[in-house]
Amino acid sequence: MKLEDLPTPCLVLELGILKRNLARMADAVARHPGLKLRPHMKTAKSLAVAALAAPNHGPITVSTIAEARYFAGGGYRDQIYAVGITPQKLDAIAAINAQGNDVKIITDDLEVASAIAAHP
């Protein structure tokens, strides 16, 4: 199959380059005790890549509710939703967390923080 014949979107990568880059990141983190790597999965969107980037279902970063659900379903329970949360998405995050996951959220907006605090 030719590259241009692949159905899109699809993930195409050089596995050797990926593994080399992941090893470089791990080496850099290892030089700083206490530092924890939390790779962002928004580009790869792949459990196979997550298994290499965050072995043993380590912590990851996501940027959509769909990614949070997908990776939680694959055993990645410790996540940061790295986009400022909106009140409309709190129910979805709560539902994911109700299944034993720990998707952390961020905000820099006082009104949203109040909505988070008031959310059941």
Label every PLM stretch briefly.
Residues 1-13:
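Generic N-terminal amphipathic, Lys/Arg-enriched alpha-helix
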Residues 9-11, 33-35, 51-54:
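A short, structure-level motif marking secondary-structure boundaries and short turns
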Residues 11-12, 22, 103:
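Generic preference for hydrophobic/aromatic residues in regular secondary structure cores
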Residues 17-47, 63:
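N-terminal glycine-rich anion-binding loops that anchor highly charged ligand groups
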Residues 38-120:
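Active-site-proximal beta-alpha core segment in soluble small-molecule metabolic enzymes
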